[in-house]
Amino acid sequence: TLKLAVGQRGNWDTSVSEIGQRAGIFKKHGLTLEIVYTQGAGETQQAVISGSVDLGVAAGVMGVLSAYSKGAPVRVIGAETTGAGDLYWYVKSDSPIKSLKDTDGKTLAYSTNGSSTHGIVTAFIKQYNLKAKLTSTGGPPGTLTAVMSNQIDVGWAAPPFGLDQLDNKQIRVIATGNDAAVFKGQTVRMLIANADVLKTRKPVVDRYMKAYRETVDYMYANPEALKVYSEWLKITEAKAKRTRDGFFPKASIIPDTITGLDTIVRDAVELKFTATQLTKEQLGELIQIPPR
């Protein structure tokens, strides 16, 4: 048995373990997964560091570098999402805000500290020289409620969440994660393990990654995967397909490489997530992706 903390229940990228378990792929590799869903990467990472879970799915890259630089027992076992086009920021349809430039003095949402959304809004502020107030709002459902009730000016979400509201013109998108130049085409979220777990149960972690890779293949090659996903979330298969095909090219969730590491390490200092650049030795210890 492996215990997992997973940020954002229902995002396509965070659903690999759930879909793989439901499809019997992890079982085939002799694994049972206990999956706990969190409000965001900050919470996921905390659970891994404290040892209350073995692995964390979708930990924000900046949060991971920050925790590791402060001596936290965290290791990277894979890339979880590369590119940030799935994340979007939105306002109520009748909001005067048309773009990020209109957010001075307004509240701009992210999920939790150290998450990919936190990294991206921090980058927005720097890149566009904004004076918005960054506000942690947890997951997409609570964030939408806050936007619709005018507690927050700009909310965040990722499909399939919010697609209905966008279609019904209740909300409109003002930015996506790719509008943050430092995150475009980079690995933004990671698969992480507690350092102790990786040391003492490496063969189990290796098996998890084998099953994970097999599930990613299944999610794009087998039409059954959309059925499993849509039944779990109680959404239509059409919406499941739109989520996958519109926002997640397969390459974006293949776990084999951390893309843009050199830039990420520099940006972590720029955006004040680490005090100094991590060295090659440190990165060698932090990043231990099991080979295919």
Task: Identify the meaning behind each predicted range.
Residues P141-E231:
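Pocket-lining segment of extracytoplasmic ligand-binding domains
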Residues E18, L65, T122, L163, ...:
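Predominant activation on well-ordered alpha-helical scaffold segments within soluble catalytic domains
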Residues I25-K28, D179-K184, P249-I258:
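Short, solvent-exposed loop/beta-turn-alpha elements that line the ligand-binding surface or hinge
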Residues R266-R292:
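Conserved C-terminal helix/tail region of periplasmic/extracytoplasmic solute-binding proteins
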Residues T1-T137, P141, A146-S149, D153-P159, ...:
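Short, glycine-/small- and polar/acidic-enriched structural segments
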Residues L198-T274:
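Secondary-structure end/capping motifs
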